Amino acid sequence: MDASSISPDHAVTVEPLLAERIEVLRGPATLLYGGGAIGGVVNVVDKKIPTAVPEKGIEAEAELRGATGTKERAGAVGITAGEGQFAVRVEGMKRRTSDYDVPDWPGGKLEGSYSESTQGSVGMSWITPRGYVGLAFTHLESKYGLPGHNHEYEGCHPHGTHLHCGGHDHDHEEEGHDHDHEHEHGGVPYVKLRSNRLDLRAEYQDPFAGFEKIRVRGGLTDYQHDEIEGGQVGTRFKNKGYDLRVELQHKPIAGWRGVVGVQNAYSDFRAEGEEAFLPRSKTRSNGLFVLEEYQLNDWRFEVGARQDWQRISPSGGASRSSLSGTSLSAAAIWDFAPQYSVALSLSRSQRLPNAQELYADGVHLATNTYELGNADLGRETSHNIDLTLRKHSGDTTFSASVFHNRVKNYIYANTLDRYEDFRLIEYTQRDAEFTGVEGELRHQFTPVFSAAVFGDYVRGKLTGGDGNLPRIPAARAGVRGNVTWQQWSGGVEYARVFSQKDIASYEDSTPGYNQVNAVVAYRGRYGATGYEVYLRGTNLLNKLAYNHASFISSVAPLPGRSVLLGVRMTY
């Protein structure tokens, strides 16, 4: 719970360096966490609350790494100790990066792309043979620049559907101009962030008749970040709230296994200062969900359902939004031959608008936009079909997927007008559709060497031939080779990211680029300590590249060449 959903320049308070694993959930399983995740859900699993007492009384992990192009210096450590029925977890992380290198760019660096972050947590659990209950407190402090934050547009304001900037209307001939990065560099604003969170987690086996397990997850969050320019706090964002979910895993019923659960969340969001483009808003949400699975010979069936209720109460006299949404999903996986399977997923999902989409009204200089919300927005409804063919074992494996989504009343940021790199956007609803393919083919040529080809493509447009949707990622294709020999492993990957010319009104096309990445690693043991030393290179061709999906792609290109050296240890 932070401010990342309000703007792409607001950091997510999740630290990958301390994550145990990162999962991507698709199909009916996404309904465990929300009804509007058309493309899937990213679930970060951490170890801040122990779930078991270490067998030898203590376990530890540590990682150190440093990079060239970003000047990253980072370290993380986690220690779990336990005795009897109690276990304690302590972990910490510190990272610092400088403005990263960019080829063919004024000064050779992207001004304002630096970051600093420090995080620490302490967790404790009471553990029994049938489950555990634990608490953890996490404190995060972060500071990062805002690249592309341009105060030349401070005087821009809307007049109907047009922009007025610098005492004159915008020139409509600006539409579709090429990338131009000859801009003035002044003092770059930055964000200073603080977050405190208290987490509760509990699991218990066989809690009562008919159920195998109960899981409880909850948290209290106190989040604040200041946007600072010239030593003065220009905007302060605050978010306080809680989230709670309870899942019950039932015993098999006529062969069906699954979970039912409830979710409740509350947040009180405030934005104060010159960029406070949102009123204070209180959001209350509740959800009921069920996910079931059935195995029948070579077939596996999954079904899921979710009902959501959301109420957003803004200050300042704006109308309250009170909406509900119903989402349904089903999938069938058929292992039709040894090593082969085909999966078909169908879903009907509903997403409810957030406070930004409903109530925004003001200049947002971090994204070079003036944002207009629409308090009359309703739910969006998506009908999705996804077909996947896999060969999952043998020397040759592959996965190929095709999907099509039709969305009624799709909510998106529509650009009404543009002056240079500044846009007037309004959150609106239109019917839209998305079509995409992705695939990978891999072959194990020898016990040591394997190679793969991969690619993905998505097309997003308004229905009825009314134009393209903005910020749709460009198509990508590539090839990678991997080597594994004794304790060594390594790989090289080449990817071609194609130009994006299917653009919306007032949007620039983005040129394509080539990217080469490589990694080599060595794993070993020293007594009771396992270790891995790795060397990773990114954008080794040092190509100037833009991310079309970014609001500020033309003024904030991707990093240039960087080489990272790191070591990871476990005890």
Task: Pin down the residues of each PLM region.
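Gram-negative outer-membrane beta-barrel transporters
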Residues: 258, 399, 403-407, 425-503, ...
